[in-house]
From Swiss-Prot:
The lineage of its organism: Bacteria, Pseudomonadati, Pseudomonadota, Gammaproteobacteria, Pseudomonadales. The keyword Ribonucleoprotein applies. This is Small ribosomal subunit protein uS15. GO terms for molecular function: rRNA binding; structural constituent of ribosome. Transmembrane segments: none annotated. The keyword Chaperone does not apply. One of the primary rRNA binding proteins, it binds directly to 16S rRNA where it helps nucleate assembly of the platform of the 30S subunit by binding and bridging several RNA helices of the 16S rRNA. Part of the 30S ribosomal subunit. Forms a bridge to the 50S subunit in the 70S ribosome, contacting the 23S rRNA. It comes from Pseudomonas fluorescens (strain Pf0-1).
């Protein structure tokens, strides 16, 4: 269910601010979004997997916190990230 090493490296490369940047909010939100999208496919096949659903809700909440932080720091970066990831808000 987790992202492959290649998928994760590609996401980090696409969203990093500088070489070696893995901790910026953009990278973290992009990784969480990819994990969330992957888990949503899992729940279509396994609707009764409540244990994993708890993890999904935790990821969604963490993404929301990071987006709120980014919105408070720099609205233009927040808007660009929302548009790039296709999130509603």
């Amino acid at each position: 269910m987790a992202l492959d090493v290649q998928e994760k490296a590609q996401i980090v490369a696409d969203y990093q601010q500088a070489v070696g940047d893995t901790g910026s909010p953009e990278v973290q939100v992009a990784l969480l979004t990819a994990n969330i999208n992957k888990l949503q496919g899992h729940f279509k096949a396994n609707g009764k997997d409540h244990h994993s659903r708890r993890g999904l809700i935790r990821m969604v909440n963490q993404r929301r916190k990071l987006l709120d932080y980014l919105k408070g720091k720099d609205v233009s970066r927040y808007s660009a990230l929302i548009a790039r990831l296709g999130l509603r808000r």
